[in-house]
């Protein structure tokens, strides 16, 4: 069992005070990082569940609910995990190979494994450096990070901290010029693709947040909009506009970067996205945070892969917690998978090194699952590897 530190209210309060101070004081931040590493060095963090257990003791309860929660009854949130249990693996035997290669490309960019970092808002809730620490950890793992519009570190700061490739996830706003300006900034900062989130015509009803009256702490902000704080009578300034298929046409006039659409759960929408010239589709239900009772991401993957038929790359996020989960998604046609909540857990436990370790755990588990199933290259993984029960 993972050692339980900081479980008392006083301990959690002191931990939060240290983290807030580290956010404001660069000199104290170095001390904070060193002490965090010492606290975790003797813990046996073997899997992502271990990280989840420890992270909960280090994140303020309302923030934890924001990170972990889903919409309404959280049916889809739970289904994202349980759906993987209905898929079993069909291992092959006596395969003669001694090396296992996990390297691949995503939209032509080399990465060390088909496991990426999903866009997620407000990462300073878990660590003073937030998204910058995540970018550092992803770079250590030689994989790609997707940075959120709602980051608590600016997209430029994230790019400066990153040693690996970046994509930028975009929400569109009522003020389209603001959206266009953010896209241009991402392009100038070296981001390699734009990920349009298309499943938020309005925010899902997240009851945990409502009960907690959750809001971003006063010492944090939407770092990509430092000079655009709306006046009280401009409440719609930052509200997402309802995207339509014409939105993709507009976005293509703003940037020459490849565009992916995130939030697709049906073959019909995948085909419409293809007609609009997208370079990739991310099969996702927003981590179970939007429409409750929607399909689990892994349940939607097959029909989208079949509809696309190789005409663009298909990715998946939602519920990935084990290397076997990633292997099942790859077998069903995903180019790569993305991790969301586990990145927060790694951040809370040990900053960029925690993120790196979370990704390395997933790498080791995926490699183990591939070898035990008789596959030593991503190229040999196909649908014959899985069976629904």
Outline where the language-model segments fall.
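N-terminal flexible/basic segments that precede or flank functional cores
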Residues: 1-43
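Short, charged beta->alpha transition segments
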Residues: 17, 99-108, 144-158
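Alpha/beta catalytic cores of nucleotide-metabolism and tRNA/nucleoside-modifying enzymes
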Residues: 43-85, 296-389
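An N-cap/entry alpha-helix motif that binds or orients negatively charged groups
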Residues: 43-111, 206, 213-243, 379-381, ...
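Short catalytic-loop micro-motif centered on adjacent basic/acidic residues
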Residues: 67, 145-147, 167-170, 259-261, ...
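Short beta->alpha linker loops
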Residues: 71-72, 149-153, 174, 265, ...
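Glycine-rich active-site/cofactor-binding loop and its immediate structural neighborhood
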Residues: 111-155
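Alpha/beta enzyme core
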Residues: 122, 135-136, 140, 157-161, ...
């Amino acid at each position: 069992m993972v050692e339980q530190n900081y479980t008392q209210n006083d301990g959690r309060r002191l931990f939060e005070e240290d983290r807030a101070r580290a956010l404001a004081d660069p000199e104290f931040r170095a001390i904070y990082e060193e002490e965090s590493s010492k606290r975790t060095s003797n813990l046996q963090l073997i899997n992502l569940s271990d990280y989840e257990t420890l992270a909960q003791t280090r994140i303020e309860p309302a923030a934890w609910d924001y990170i972990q929660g889903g919409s309404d009854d959280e049916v889809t949130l739970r289904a994202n995990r349980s759906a993987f249990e209905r898929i079993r693996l069909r291992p092959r035997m006596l395969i003669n190979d001694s090396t296992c290669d996990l390297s691949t490309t995503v939209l032509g960019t080399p990465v060390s494994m088909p496991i990426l970092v999903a866009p997620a808002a407000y990462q300073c809730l878990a660590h003073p450096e937030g998204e910058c620490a995540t970018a550092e950890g992803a770079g250590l793992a030689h994989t790609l990070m997707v940075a959120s519009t709602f980051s608590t570190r600016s997209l430029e700061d994230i790019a400066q901290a990153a040693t690996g490739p970046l994509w930028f996830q975009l929400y569109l706003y009522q003020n389209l010029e603001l959206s266009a300006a953010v896209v241009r900034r991402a392009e100038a900062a070296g981001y390699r693709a734009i990920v349009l989130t298309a499943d938020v015509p309005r925010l899902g009803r997240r009851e945990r947040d409502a009960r907690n009256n959750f809001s971003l702490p006063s010492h944090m902000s939407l770092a990509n909009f430092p000079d655009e704080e709306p006046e009280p009578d401009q409440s719609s300034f930052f509200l997402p506009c309802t995207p339509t298929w014409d939105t993709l046409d507009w976005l293509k006039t703003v940037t020459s970067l490849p565009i992916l659409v995130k939030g697709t759960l049906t073959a019909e929408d995948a085909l419409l996205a293809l007609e609009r010239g997208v370079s990739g589709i991310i099969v996702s239900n927003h981590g179970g945070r939007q429409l409750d009772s929607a399909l689990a991401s892994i349940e939607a993957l097959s029909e989208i892969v079949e509809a696309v038929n190789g005409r663009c790359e298909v990715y998946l996020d939602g519920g990935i917690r084990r290397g076997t989960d990633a292997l099942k998604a790859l077998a069903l046609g995903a180019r790569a998978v993305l991790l969301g909540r586990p990145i927060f857990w790694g951040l809370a436990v040990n900053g960029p090194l925690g993120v790196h370790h979370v990704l390395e755990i997933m790498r080791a588990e995926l490699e183990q699952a591939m070898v035990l199933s008789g596959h030593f290259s991503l190229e040999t993984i196909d649908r014959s590897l899985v069976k629904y029960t």
